[in-house]
């Protein structure tokens, strides 16, 4: 089963086409990762999946229906998005920010309910941020803040969670912390995770499904072990490398080369 499908999807701004005639299927209940060079359209594609950018042509299909034929409230109850570098209102506490995830369920007839409170508390527990609930968000570390933002998307209680570079500007320890959390949410709670990552090796380790975006379309898609090879890295990133098995996780491991090749280093030694 698929969570999100694109059919002949073309995206752009004004006269510039960013994505052209893209057909992909992102599996339900899995972790999917979009990879590609800077400016290739990964973030643009994620915006279209979240109904934040209308296609120039084609469609994004959610639950068997064109996402742009569904109401904003209906889409917000099916998927949540965490953009790059979100800003929290000054002075807002962790619990107040996480509570904003319940906004799609509020209207003038339905105010804050016991269910809303329960979902917020559950999201805090799932992300290990319940002990931080009364602290200001701007007083937290980078890893803590990212977990709080993820908690807000969980409070929204959607089947699909979209994340645009959730590890950006985090140190390595916090990158692993965030990615472990996302995988746990997928495996233990059945969330469909779709995210953009720049680190190829972490993408291979955490992804069930991978889409390589290049030349305005999907250059390859499938399990990392099936699609990631030296030819793909050369084409998509214009980078020479060797792909070897990760000795611990048994996923593809990319060893990139710069101007100095391995044999040159060996000769110098």
UniProtKB/Swiss-Prot annotation:
Q: Which PROSITE patterns match?
A: ABC_TRANSPORTER_1 (PS00211), ABC_TRANSPORTER_2 (PS50893)
Membrane topology classification: Peripheral membrane protein
Matching entries from InterPro entries are given as: AAA+_ATPase (IPR003593), ABC_transporter-like_ATP-bd (IPR003439), ABC_transporter-like_CS (IPR017871), P-loop_NTPase (IPR027417), Siderophore_ABC-ATPase (IPR051535)
Main localization (coarse) = membrane
Query: Is Membrane a UniProt keyword of this protein?
Result: yes
| Any Pfam family hit | ABC_tran
Q: Which residues bind ATP?
A: 36-43
**Annotated keywords:** ATP-binding, Cell inner membrane, Cell membrane, Ion transport, Iron, Iron transport, Membrane, Nucleotide-binding, Transport
Location in the cell reads:
Cell inner membrane
An MF annotation (GO) of this entry = ATP binding
The UniProt entry, under Gene3D superfamilies, shows: P-loop containing nucleotide triphosphate hydrolases
CDD domains, per this entry? ABC_Iron-Siderophores_B12_Hemin
| SUPFAM superfamilies in the record | P-loop containing nucleoside triphosphate hydrolases
ABC transporter domain: from which residue to which, for each copy? 4-240
Say if the entry is tagged with keyword NADP.
no
Q: Which domain of life is it from?
A: Bacteria
Question: Which GO terms are recorded in the biological process aspect for this UniProt protein?
Answer: achromobactin transport
For this record, an example GO cellular component is: plasma membrane
Q: Which family does it belong to?
A: Belongs to the ABC transporter superfamily.
Job description of the protein: Part of the binding-protein-dependent transport system CbrABCD for uptake of the siderophore achromobactin. Probably responsible for energy coupling to the transport system.
Protein name (database record): Achromobactin transport ATP-binding protein CbrD
The scientific name of the source species is Dickeya dadantii (strain 3937)
Task: Output the lineage of the source organism.
Answer: Bacteria, Pseudomonadati, Pseudomonadota, Gammaproteobacteria, Enterobacterales
What gene name does this entry carry?
cbrD
